[in-house]
Amino acid sequence: MNTKKLFIWLLYLIAPLVSIAQESTQYPTDYLSPAFHAGRRAAFREKLSANGVGIFFASQVRVRNNDVDYQYAQSKNFYYFTGLEESDAMLLLFKQPVTILNKTGTEFIFVKNRDPQKELWTGKILGVEGVKARYKMENVFTNDQFTASTIDFTTIDSVFSAYRNEGIFSKYKRVEDPLSHMANIVDSIINTQNKPIAARSTQMILSSLRGIKQPEEIALIAKAAAISCEGHNDVMRAIKPGMAEYQAQAIMEYHFKTNGSEYPGYPSINGAAENSCVLHYITNLKTINDGEMLLSDCAAEYHGYSADVTRTVPANGKFTEAQKIIYELVLKAQDAGFAACVPGAPFGNPDAAARKVVYEGLMQLGIAANEAEARKYFPHGTSHHLGLDVHDMGPRTLLPGVILTVEPGIYIP
């Protein structure tokens, strides 16, 4: 290799490290820390069986049409354990140290090779050295280093993975790509050696970990909530008869993006009149008329964590007497739900408290004759866990660190 070619290759290898250093001043710095992800991996490994292995895959790129992809969204579990937001990657977490490709440890990650042509079109690929530098992971390899002989499964007693149905890795077999290739190899080994798949146990472990938020996570959820509230407040100021639902959505999502939110936490719901009674209405096309109410169920996602905020306001800025009565009943129910959020209480307590207020109120108003009839106007639960997923996983007991929503509602067509 001549000197010129060697110099070019050195620049190519050093570039990601220089770029990562520059990002500390040119890009957001409030992502989850490498120490956070390392701590979560250690906590997961602690809960594995004596000789278990956890296997997690990055999300695949999804095609929107022809040669255009959807904006990439990482698997939440993979993100939780690594922070990496690239496709075509696999994480292995072992209870006991093993040796893979002459490296001994309990954590191994396989990632994409750097590719100048792909990077020209879709942006920088971190590669092995970039992942080591950014996420402080030691045992990092390229996908093409993974073969059927890479892992000795003979001593493994259980495989912990969140995937099953038609073979737990079937979702990765649709397209021939590096991720599918690795998944097929792992699946073949597991089937050949009859290793049990602890899918249910995996979900229970993930729920116990992800359900109790760490301080870094709470800060990101609070940021997502603050961004979301800014959007809701501006919609309340801007709404007027003649505005379209999609204009309310545009105002909302403008605030999300201008405050650094990567995505909405879920498709924005902005429904007026009859559309406000469709729980997951996302068409957002109707013109909002005088006297109608607009329900906005919209929230930002910030660095992987979602908020969840719903507000209902009159288009003309003034509640009718009937609208005010129902609004205040829902507010009273929400306050009852908040009061029931006590550490150690069953997860269902806020729902029971809010539902009692709604049912009694609707019967007193003569809208419902009994609880069964009242339920038609309050058809969903009051609370769910909130975090990496807007409907997140978590324990069935209200423990310190649990974040949940309290969102009763009354829907009268």
List each model region and its residues.
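Bacterial Sec-dependent N-terminal signal peptides
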Residues: M1-E23
